[in-house]
């Protein structure tokens, strides 16, 4: 009964994965008065030339910057001639301002002054949303070519290229639709009966496949027949897929490959194939297995190989002499000198390898062999390096263990090493548990001391957790706990791919990723796999415009017209202000990060940016009189900084006593005071002298 339940669970998860891959992704966000919309009855929509969204309602005009709604309407004493705030329509005029119909009157909303103006001969029509008719749905095509339709009754459908129209989600995904607008970024806005909807269509990057039972992927491997093997921990299975990505079957304990869900006898942590075609499996905690004699690729003979220093096998590598090097967690590195023999001989570190550092390298995670026959081992206590030799001389091999050193800056950044990889130039990269990636700079890998270049948070990388690292074209790809980081070793530039990129929460496993026969990369997850084509590992090219959404001076709210200003002049009694801004990326507003800088010399060559995370305001206090330049920039939806710097010049007016004439006057007053004091002293002394002379003459 339990087996039937597992099979059913797996089948459902596979069906779910297929469905998720076939159905395009869209995010639907609903807004109403609870979110700040000034009134639920929206009569029209428009997007201005900068990208800001505007909505006409029966309670004035409403602006949305991606974070908050703000209303604009007539106020008593503001000089506006609006008799009512019942907006019937809004449209974008050719001059960049907004036209508004208020009942039967026409007004211009001046975006430079943020005021309603009654002018003659104004443009009576412009760009705004399209009405949805009962017999004419609104059509929108997303970035990958899917055709979306919004129907009058609220139905939302999609039609892939060459496919058929299919309902999205429930039969009625939205409230009854009245108007629709496709913005400059490709988002779809729907004005419904009592709310508005924003529908965004994120780029689908790869495919996340959950295995349904929370099993961690421990090993992925491609054999010589272009089949790929996936071993998972909790359910103790080994799945085999053909080059067409079809499931061949499960590896059974007796060596057969069976179609139904079948457990292997223990969790498999590593898989490799030797030159003679044998498949070797490393497990925890049952040691080493050899698979030979494949019959039509459907059955193997399985031999258990004993004699290891530990039965926790994490990696297996074959050197050019045909020997196997086994990484064990607890028994160090072991060598199988004759792997083809019926009973292979195992050389263990604590008896056969006489120079092995027993105290430092007991727990080995991974082994890397270079073309120059240098073995580099990732251990929990450092990087173990040795030069391979031929024949029985392995017993006299010399090992060097490199660890983190407190007083050497170019030492290994973290002793807990995860894996080792080479790039296309043969440079060696070492991933660590919490110290990022290290590149070996020393030419001689077997030197007593190695020098490392660090790629970590201290040097600009987004994370220090590097579960593994692999060569990726002319760059390196680091696998973090929840992200992938592609970086250029020469200049340190990087691209970070996280939750926003995957459109899902991904927790990566320690399994080293592999390139599949179809060109995609396969990454192990804590509960499944992530598949992605190399060309999909790229960043969004959209550069959001930054709008200045408001300013507060000395705690008093100022005009929204700051968005149209190049220069803001503060009075002599105004020394502190808060500037609010928003990058107009409606597909990822809450995921954007910001930074600002304050320049007092106008030099933008070497700007020191203040990163403020997701906060979209900057407060500057107690400014001295003078002219400043405030710079604001943001990331895009993928977290990459883009070239969208917004500049605002701030002129702080000095008080009279801070001006040059006041300083001159003060100097003159001081000189006059000192001059008067000196004159008085001299006068008094002269009088005293005259009195003394008169007294002497009298006597």
Where are these regions (language model features)?
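Cytoplasmic C-terminal tails of single-pass
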Residues: 688-699
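Carboxylate-rich, polar loop motifs that coordinate divalent cations or form catalytic acidic clusters
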Residues: 1-683
């Amino acid at each position: 009964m339990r087996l039937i339940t597992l099979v059913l669970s797996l089948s459902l998860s596979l069906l779910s994965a297929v469905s998720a891959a076939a159905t395009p992704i869209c995010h639907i966000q609903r807004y109403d008065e609870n979110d700040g919309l000034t009134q639920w009855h929206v009569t029209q929509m428009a997007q201005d030339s900068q990208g800001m969204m505007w909505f006409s309602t029966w309670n004035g005009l409403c602006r949305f910057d991606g974070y908050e709604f703000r209303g604009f309407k007539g106020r008593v004493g503001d000089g506006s001639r609006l008799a009512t705030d019942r907006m019937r329509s809004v449209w974008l005029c050719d001059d960049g301002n907004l036209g508004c119909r208020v009942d039967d009157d026409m007004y211009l909303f001046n975006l430079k002054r943020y005021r309603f103006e009654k002018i003659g001969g104004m443009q009576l029509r412009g760009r705004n949303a399209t009405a949805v008719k009962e017999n004419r749905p609104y059509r929108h095509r997303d970035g990958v070519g899917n055709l979306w339709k919004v129907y009058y009754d609220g139905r939302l459908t999609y039609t892939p290229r060459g496919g058929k129209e299919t309902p999205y989600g429930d039969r009625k995904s939205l409230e009854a639709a009245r108007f629709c607008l496709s913005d400059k970024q490709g988002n779809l806005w729907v004005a419904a009966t009592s709310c508005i909807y924003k529908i965004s269509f994120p780029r689908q990057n790869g495919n996340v496949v959950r295995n349904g039972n929370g099993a961690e992927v421990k090993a992925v491997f491609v054999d010589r027949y272009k089949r790929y093997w996936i071993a998972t921990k909790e359910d103790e299975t080994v799945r085999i897929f053909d080059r067409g990505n079809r499931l061949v079957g499960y590896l059974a304990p007796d060596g057969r490959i069976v179609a139904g869900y079948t457990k292997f006898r223990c969790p498999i942590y590593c898989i490799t194939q030797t030159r003679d075609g044998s498949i070797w499996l490393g497990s925890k905690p049952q040691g080493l297995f050899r698979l030979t004699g494949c019959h039509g690729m459907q059955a193997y003979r399985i031999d258990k190989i004993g004699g290891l220093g530990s039965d926790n096998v994490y990696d297996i590598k074959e050197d050019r002499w045909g020997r196997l090097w086994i990484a064990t967690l607890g028994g160090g590195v072991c060598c199988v000198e004759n792997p083809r023999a019926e009973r292979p001989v195992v050389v263990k570190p604590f008896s056969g390898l006489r120079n092995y550092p027993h105290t430092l390298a007991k727990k080995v995670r991974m082994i890397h062999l270079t073309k120059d026959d240098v073995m580099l081992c990732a251990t929990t206590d450092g990087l173990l390096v040795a030069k391979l030799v031929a024949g029985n001389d392995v017993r006299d091999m010399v090992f060097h263990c490199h660890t983190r050193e407190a007083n050497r800056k170019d030492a290994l950044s973290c002793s807990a090493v995860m894996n080792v990889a080479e790039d296309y130039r043969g440079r060696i990269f070492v991933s660590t548990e919490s110290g990022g990636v290290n590149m070996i700079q020393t030419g001689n890998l077997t030197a007593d001391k190695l020098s490392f270049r660090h790629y970590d948070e201290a040097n600009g990388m987004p994370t220090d957790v590097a579960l593994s690292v692999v060569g990726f074209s002319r760059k390196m790809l680091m696998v973090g706990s929840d992200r992938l980081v592609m970086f250029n070793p020469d200049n340190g530039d990087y691209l970070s791919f996280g939750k926003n990129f995957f459109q899902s929460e991904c927790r990566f496993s320690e399994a080293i990723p592999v390139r599949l026969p179809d060109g995609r990369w396969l990454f192990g997850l804590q509960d499944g796999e992530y598949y992605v084509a190399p060309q999909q590992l790229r960043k969004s090219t959209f550069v959001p415009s930054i709008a200045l959404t408001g300013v507060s001076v000395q705690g008093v709210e100022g005009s929204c017209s700051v968005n149209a200003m190049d220069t803001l002049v503060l009075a002599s009694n105004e020394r502190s202000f808060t500037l609010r801004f928003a990058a107009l990326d409606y597909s990822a507003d809450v995921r954007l990060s910001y930074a600002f800088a304050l320049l007092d010399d106008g030099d933008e060559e070497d700007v020191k940016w203040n990163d403020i995370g997701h906060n979209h305001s900057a407060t500057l206090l107690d400014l001295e009189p003078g002219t400043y330049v405030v710079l604001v920039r943001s990331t895009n939806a993928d977290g990459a900084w883009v070239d969208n710097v917004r500049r605002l010049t701030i002129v702080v007016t000095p008080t009279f006593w801070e001006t040059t004439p006041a300083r001159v006057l003060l100097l003159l007053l001081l000189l006059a005071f000192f001059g008067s004091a000196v004159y008085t002293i001299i006068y008094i002394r002269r009088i005293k002298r005259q009195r003394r002379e008169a007294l002497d003459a009298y006597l």
